[in-house]
Amino acid sequence: MLLRIALILGCWSILSEGAENDIAEREDRKRPIWNMAHMVNAISQIHEFGALGANSIETDVSFDKNAKPEYTFHGIPCDCFRNCMNWEYFNHFLEGLRNATTPGNPKYRDRMILVVFDLKSNGLYYDAQARDAGKNLALSLLQNYWNNGDNGGRAYIVLSVPLLKHYELFQGFRETLKEQGHEELLEKVGYDFSGNDDISDIEEAYRLAGISEHIWQSDGITNCIYRGFDRVIQAVNAREKFEGIIKKVYFWTADKPSTVKLALGESVDGIMTNYPNVVVDVLKIDEYQQRFRFATIDDNPWEKYKPYGK
């Protein structure tokens, strides 16, 4: 009798393990999605949008006359039905962000895994300040977010620049982290040009910057205006090239369920939205639940998605 029970339990254990493996395999086949809360410029909003299901945020960064990051602020005009005026001093915001993304901190949110800094380099006094802006940004992040490399925030960072001619901002950022002895932190940093330029021009700007990895590509417009998906399709096609440098594509700003569905239908990796809960609801629908899942910290945002086994 005891032998029979042992055999039954053993078989049940094997079957259970097999079922768990099947579930894990099905999850691996799903495209991870970064649910990106738009215009998160106050510390309180990190937690507000996280509670709505965001696993990523986008934050606006303005610079002072000396090309130092000064505020997290968008201002008027901004998206329809949003308060455009939330703000923090940049370094103070970084401290709040570090608290929200550092395991063990009482304010830690384990789902918050990526931050897009929308760098308002078009507000610099001179184009020649772009490199200095990158240097100053690196120093601010190093001290106030990464805590000088000592148990800082763990979120991945995407530096998003609106103008191709400001590619030197990326160079200044990278040079500074290397000079400060923290080149390893570049593994946490990605890049994006957000001006909806031609993909070929964007690739040339990255060539000039000396960057060929960790590249996201955005496409979109304010939620006040409809935008089609022609350029999204171009970006996705560029991503799918065997030797293409683009690894992830995200669309902004998608607030309606219909827009979210269209974006997912084009196989984007990220959706920037004013309503992360809308994206959550769409991914609960069987058609989308079978193909997509929300990204976690274990998903590498610098790697092209490949279905399990391919």
Swiss-Prot record:
GO terms for cellular component: extracellular region. Residues 1-18 form the signal peptide. Disulfide bonds join 78-84, 80-224. Keywords: Cytolysis, Dermonecrotic toxin, Disulfide bond, Glycoprotein, Hemolysis, Lipid degradation, Lipid metabolism, Lyase, Magnesium, Metal-binding, Secreted, Signal, Toxin, Zymogen. The active site is at residues 38, 74. It catalyses: an N-(acyl)-sphingosylphosphocholine = an N-(acyl)-sphingosyl-1,3-cyclic phosphate + choline; an N-(acyl)-sphingosylphosphoethanolamine = an N-(acyl)-sphingosyl-1,3-cyclic phosphate + ethanolamine; a 1-acyl-sn-glycero-3-phosphocholine = a 1-acyl-sn-glycero-2,3-cyclic phosphate + choline; a 1-acyl-sn-glycero-3-phosphoethanolamine = a 1-acyl-sn-glycero-2,3-cyclic phosphate + ethanolamine. It comes from the Eukaryota. Its main location: secreted. Expressed by the venom gland. It is found in: Secreted. Mg(2+) binds at residues 58, 60, 118. It is an enzyme of class 4 (lyase). Binds 1 Mg(2+) ion per subunit. The keyword Glycosyltransferase does not apply. Residues 19-26 form a propeptide. Its EC number is 4.6.1.-. GO terms for molecular function: lyase activity; metal ion binding; phosphoric diester hydrolase activity; toxin activity. Its cofactor is Mg(2+). Glycans are attached at residue 99. GO terms for biological process: killing of cells of another organism; lipid catabolic process. Belongs to the arthropod phospholipase D family. Class II subfamily. Dermonecrotic toxins cleave the phosphodiester linkage between the phosphate and headgroup of certain phospholipids (sphingolipid and lysolipid substrates), forming an alcohol (often choline) and a cyclic phosphate. This toxin acts on sphingomyelin (SM). It may also act on ceramide phosphoethanolamine (CPE), lysophosphatidylcholine (LPC) and lysophosphatidylethanolamine (LPE), but not on lysophosphatidylserine (LPS), and lysophosphatidylglycerol (LPG). It acts by transphosphatidylation, releasing exclusively cyclic phosphate products as second products. This is Dermonecrotic toxin LiSicTox-alphaII2. It comes from Loxosceles intermedia.
